[in-house]
Swiss-Prot record:
It catalyses: a beta-D-glucosylceramide + H2O = an N-acyl-sphingoid base + D-glucose; a beta-D-glucosyl-(1<->1')-N-acylsphing-4-enine + H2O = an N-acylsphing-4-enine + D-glucose; an N-acyl-1-beta-D-glucosyl-15-methylhexadecasphing-4-enine + H2O = an N-acyl-15-methylhexadecasphing-4-enine + D-glucose. Glucosylceramidase that catalyzes the hydrolysis of glucosylceramides into free ceramides and glucose. C.elegans contains specific sphingoid bases, which are unique or different in structure compared to the sphingoid bases found in other animals. Two examples of these distinctive compounds are: 15-methylhexadecasphinganine and 15-methylhexadecasphing-4-enine. This is Putative glucosylceramidase 1. GO terms for biological process: glucosylceramide catabolic process.
Amino acid sequence: MKSRFLLKIFIFLAVFGVDSVRAADCTEKTFKTGTVCVCSLDSCDEIPPLDITMGQAALYTTSHTGARLHRDVIYATDTEPFGTLHMTIDSSKKYQTIQGFGSTFSDASGANLKSLPDKLSDLIMKQYFSDTGLNLQFGRVPIASTDFSGRVYSYNDVANDYSMQNFNLTKEDFQWKIPYIKNAQKYNPNLKLFAAPWAAPGWLKTTKEMTGPGALNGKAGDNYHQAYAKYFVRFLEEYGKSGISFWGLSTQNQPTLGSDKKNKIQSTLFTAETQRDFIKTDLGPALAASSSGKDVKLLILDDNRGNLPKWADTVLNDMDAAKYVGGIGVHAYQDGETDNHLDETHKKHPNFFILGTEASEGYGSKDTHVDYGNWDRAADTASDILDNMNNWMTGWTERNLILDALGGPSWVSDYTDAPVIAFPAMAQFYKQPMFYAIAHFSHFIKPGAVRIDHSLNVIELEVETTAFLNPDGSKVIVMLNKGSLVSTEHTVVVQDAADSRNHYHFTLPHRAITTLYIQTSQF
């Protein structure tokens, strides 16, 4: 009887090709717009391990109904089953190499981590940076203060100190940035850090203020520009004294913001032309002459994609500037409006990587900044990553690691949502649906993976897809069913052009994200 029962189970799995495995428990809390997972010192859900063998696939699903990286094991079938969507992946056609995903060590993030018990903040770092968590590969580090700081500060407020003798890090660095960078490095020793200034010290600007509009005084090559270049080098040197080195450096966060007369936050105006001239005359040579800066990858733009490709053309067509540049930083706030700009930029400048340097949800003036359990923000996050990956981007970075219930702290009340929200009074944190949306990419797509060709048999406007080949030969397919127009569940059949005998059959629920991880040694 027992052998007959086991035979029936085997036949069921062979026919239907799915073996459901319960995910690690999420302590759910439901709100008007959706569900969060509550984490404390007693419990916190984790990503279920792959636990598959050659020829099997693991399917992870997150949905608006509450599934959070629920895992099913998919068994390949040698006959093509019925499906409403047929997807073919072809690893012989390769595109960009993926560098990884990341988040930002903002003052606000550090303040919130510090507000929690040490073991709980350590758990957050593990959830973000370990290979059992989101496996983040990048950390963005602000140079001095931002809108997500408790106050406005620079590293040298001594006017006319062109040699930067009075440069010094602040309490925010020693309390909120450096400790948590090191904590993250404990879980990912290969973490790539890139720094970005929101503003030059006020005395270097035309307005004499860090906040609001204004450019650097003078022009490239003068005392002001030379001093600002030294400011960058001194930052790298001082962090080096704490054992922290940097992979990359942005010339300026959102340089176009400095032209906005209504802008209230820290900013410094650069045009493409003035950024080009600053790089080739001042910053590039200063970094090249510095032991802490000579190997740093310099990023240009670090602003919305609508500035491309013209911005890249202006800087990178000048060989005296381009020789110092590693890549192009892009923000997410015009995504969906200007899809072809990334593709066009890559075609013109294929030797320079494109990196997503900032993205967030809930930043609009009329938005509910922190909206617990909001599924649409998870879908928007996934859609943004899918769009960027399919248009030559090599990585993607979240604006904050963790914020409070207001979406801060922020000295200028510039609140947003975040993947993790802190509740220090209860010694808890909430993992928003956005956290899981990021995990569908970052946990499975390994550094060095390449995007590969994929196609669907029909045009389905509500479904977005992408596919990757990992360095170990495993393949990753991410699908989003936004379901914002029509409530449609899809049955999906994935076929690998490299092995046409095997088909993977699964369900893509309405308003859901899935990741299919295929274990194979085939390249």
